[in-house]
Amino acid sequence: MIAENGLLKFREPEGGTRFRMVIAGDVCPCREGEKIVAEGRSAGLFAKVAPFLNEADLRVVQWETPLCEPENPILKSGPNLYALPSSAELAAAGGFEVALLANNHTGDYGPEMLLQTIDVLNRRGIRTVGAGADLEEAEKPLTLTAGGEKIAIFNFCEHEFGTAQENMPGSAPQLPLRNLRAVAEAARSADRVVAALHGGHEYNPFPSPRIQELCRAFADAGASFVFNCHAHCPEGVEYRNGTPIVYCPGNFYFPLTDEGGLWRFGYLPKALFDRRGVYALEILPYAFDAEQIVPLEGETRISFFRYLETLSEPLDDPARMKQLFEAWSSRHGFGYLARSLAHIPPGWEEHPSDRAVAKAMLGLRNLFSCEAHNDIVRCFLCLQEENRIDEAAKLFPYMEKLQNPEWA
């Protein structure tokens, strides 16, 4: 139960609070953010959430874009996002010390611009994790001291586009066996280990069974705090053997003018650590527009807390979580598959090396390589095989209602 002051307490603290850490969701300044920077109004964007942020010993943000000019975008399915290098001012104005770069957009303008993004952020005093000059560097945790604690932060994303390879810059891919071993090793020497992941299904208010299993595995491997992001909407929270898991806090600042629903709503989770680990989360719900991020107040704030509890309730019920994902897949799986297949040109098999053919097949490539896309198509095809699509879809109206709550 989330208290009216936003405190989600898992247990009583032992020896008082030793360390506070907040992680913000997706930030992509887009053109509106660039305008704020150009007009010298960066601090104003965060003014109303600054007191909450400033109480933390460590502030981390999910940075969802390269910092570059829009030249030479890579071939990919999906949009190539960018923000001008000057937009790093927003991260600095928010007081963020760390930027998470393992996501599906960091590499949108190629390896050189990814490395430039790291450099631009570093020059603003913002350390980065989740991307690097090659796979080994991208996978490395960021180790730092904050609040008198030695912290190791890991950051991994799904296999979309722009992931690092042995000899190529990119973001750190989710390679669970390698990643979990690294977290377990770090847990033996660091005071706190944070596993920050990027993956899942956009606009789905619930994580998939695979995402939930993966996040729980990081908790079991020794992570003190597990954070996931990507859905562009709030998802729930659970407490796994002493480790909180935030499945998605929603966007923090992503001012696309044509997005409705829950796109502009989210929450800041602040983890409160005692000597044993995290004993509570402080949750600050907010809404944003192009100009400012504003905490929710009054009945809207309370309604958000009850909504987050609704999203969290089924997380300990595997059968229910399977039903929810089957419902989602029953409505969206066919679209993923149909769009990808529709772009494949006739006779492609005679010219597989043709660049036009390669570009046309990028969507299909993403279905096979991106874990979340693979999940949804595989689930849809299994439902089709078992003649259960209509049965699974009966639960979808409930999910649609959650996508458009009355308070939003």
Residue ranges and their predicted role:
Residues 32-47, 81-82, 143-193, 213, ...:
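Binuclear metal-dependent hydrolase catalytic cores centered on His/Asp/Glu-rich metal-binding motifs
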